[in-house]
């Protein structure tokens, strides 16, 4: 898993470098959207590291499902081995990669983002009744707003992992129940309740802060491992087009939850 933040160079310079890593069709598609252009190129540079047949980031090509979910088209060895998902928010791009071919979904948001003065009104429109009720039980406004953003991020990661997207699986039609541990990190544990899910894919979640000093929060959704738990999550960090660096908890790779 990798994150990138464009603090060390101008967006225009990053976009110029990114253009060299996308196809002509992609340049046309992404014209005027530097963030998506950089994210697309960054995904290629991350994915190529997982396959020895990819000599250049441009060797990595993508296919898209009926609802827009991306997958690796080539090289064939990479397509068979890796599933991936991409999200970006306020200068941070997150790329999730599985190395066993499983699907995954990732979403990143600023947990300090405020959607308006009335979180409850927004929740009633978009979330399930149980989720809205649980949010309303949180007394402190800031804590309730942060909980909303974490929940939204988790739900987004699920619909991306499933390939359905928000249009195919409206947020109001499934629940994510959560508990908050009494530890210093206020660790969340989450349980998906989707009545249309046939149970063939036991989805698990990891809710992460890639760096403790920043307000971004990421949710990763992927199938459970052999032990029924979330597979091991490895967090890596990079500036755009630079080598990836492993991040451990002591250096800011803080994990909110994995369950």
Regions found by a protein language model. Name each.
Residues 1-259:
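Core catalytic alpha/beta fold that binds nucleotide/phospho-ligands
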């Amino acid at each position: 898993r990798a994150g990138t933040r464009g603090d060390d160079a101008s967006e225009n310079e990053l976009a110029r470098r990114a253009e060299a890593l996308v196809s002509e069709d992609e340049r046309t598609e992404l014209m005027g959207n530097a963030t998506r252009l950089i994210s697309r190129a960054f995904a290629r540079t991350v994915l190529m590291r997982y396959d020895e047949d990819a000599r250049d980031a441009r060797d990595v090509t993508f296919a898209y499902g009926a609802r827009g979910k991306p997958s690796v088209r080539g090289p064939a060895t990479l397509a068979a081995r890796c599933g991936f998902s991409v999200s970006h928010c306020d200068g941070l791009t997150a790329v999730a990669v599985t190395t066993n071919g499983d699907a995954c979904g990732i979403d990143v948001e600023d947990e300090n983002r405020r959607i308006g003065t009335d979180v409850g009104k927004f929740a009633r429109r978009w979330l399930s009744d149980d989720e809205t009720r649980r949010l309303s039980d949180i007394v402190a406004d800031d804590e309730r707003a942060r909980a909303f953003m974490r929940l939204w991020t988790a739900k987004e990661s699920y619909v991306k992992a499933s390939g359905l997207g928000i249009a195919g699986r409206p947020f109001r039609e499934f629940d994510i129940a959560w508990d908050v541990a009494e530890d210093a990190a206020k660790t969340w544990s989450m349980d998906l309740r989707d009545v249309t899910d046939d149970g063939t894919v036991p989805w698990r979640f990891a809710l992460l802060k890639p760096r403790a000093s920043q307000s971004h929060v990421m949710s990763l959704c992927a199938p459970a491992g052999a032990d029924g738990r979330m597979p091991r999550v490895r967090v890596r960090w990079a500036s755009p087009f630079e080598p990836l660096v492993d991040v451990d908890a002591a250096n800011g790779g803080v994990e909110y939850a994995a369950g």
